[in-house]
Amino acid sequence: MGKTGGTSFRVFIESNVKKHYFGYGKTHVLTHEDLDIRDPSKFTELEPKGHSVFEHFDLFSEHAPWGLHRYLKTKEYQYITMLREPVSRTISAYRYAMDRGWINEDKNIIDWFHEKENKDKKHYQINYCSGVSIDAPLEIKLDKALINLKSENFLFGLTSKYNEFVDLCCLVNDWKPQYRRINITKAKKEISKDDRKELEELLLDEINFYEEAVNIYNKKYKKVTI
């Protein structure tokens, strides 16, 4: 998922898996949460080697929802992701869009949030963890997302406990750790208290989901000695 673990986490995973496939812009058409974008037939247009990649590679790395396992031959698969406090994640996505020049610096974060192309932001992590259509009722998406988080095929951590999750991944998969370095970044656009408060209201479903995910994380991995 975008703006959770970052490039550091992807590099950590790829350093531990010999045959990794960075399918950015390719595999998402198989599982995209927006059914207007999800189009499995498009994958063979984007990937010259077609579905044979699912038999060759051991890691598929991209911002894509739950569901890619349906295209794998093996039944032994593992989803790995990190979850982030929703307001913090949304602000990070907004600043990233600004840094990339996708929006002007005078664009208010609330106005940006309500733009049509950002309709996924309200339930962003719920959508990704559920693999259900973005337009499905919240109850269906939420139930599926929580079921997936509890699955043994889903290894997840929290951005706030980054190094702890790296250790967990290493313990579960017998990997070598690679911890995040402290980055020095340029000054960031400040978000007003009023805008933060409004984001909390807009992201209430995501916040409730995140809090439940934290509870699942604590119960699921409490017996794991790190």
Which residues does each predicted region cover?
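Glycine-rich phosphate-binding P-loop
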Residues: 1-10
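PAPS-dependent sulfotransferase catalytic domain
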Residues: 23, 29-82, 87-179
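Short, hydrophobic alpha-helix immediately C-terminal to the catalytic nucleophile
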Residues: 10-14, 167
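PAPS-dependent sulfotransferase catalytic core
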Residues: 34-37, 45, 62-66, 131, ...
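A residue-level signal for conserved active-site and pocket-lining positions in enzyme catalytic cores
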Residues: 5, 85, 169, 206, ...
